[in-house]
Amino acid sequence: MSAHLQWMVVRNCSSFLIKRNKQTYSTEPNNLKARNSFRYNGLIHRKTVGVEPAADGKGVVVVMKRRSGQRKPATSYVRTTINKNARATLSSIRHMIRKNKYHPDLRMAAIRRASAILRSQKPVMVKRKRTRPTKSS
């Protein structure tokens, strides 16, 4: 079944839809922008990309849907864990999307999602309040 036909079926009646503030969002896996649109839908296309936080809380997991094995859903997804520094992680995601010939418009969305995940995993530095010395008379 073509992606356009699947989109016509799924676009208004999906269990992943969230309608808030006159906008429609989607919580489906491999939807990089969480937007209910044909371009970012993670269910209907033959090749999709998803970025998730790693289970141990360090690094990201890149989930790629392969073109081969469409009839075998259990083996159609490849999960790659990347646990490097931020620059190396983002460049490896960029290379994975480019070399495997995924949609070029998904590249920037995947990089932004991975960057936000890596930023959330950084430890937060607690700023100490400076105390003023008390006046002694």
Curated annotation (Swiss-Prot):
GO terms for cellular component: cytoplasm; ribonucleoprotein complex; ribosome. Component of the large ribosomal subunit. The ribosome is a large ribonucleoprotein complex responsible for the synthesis of proteins in the cell. The keyword Transcription regulation does not apply. The keyword RNA-binding does not apply. The gene is RPL28. There is a cross-link at K58, K65 (Glycyl lysine isopeptide (Lys-Gly) (interchain with G-Cter in SUMO2)). Its main location: cytoplasm. GO terms for biological process: translation. This is Large ribosomal subunit protein eL28.
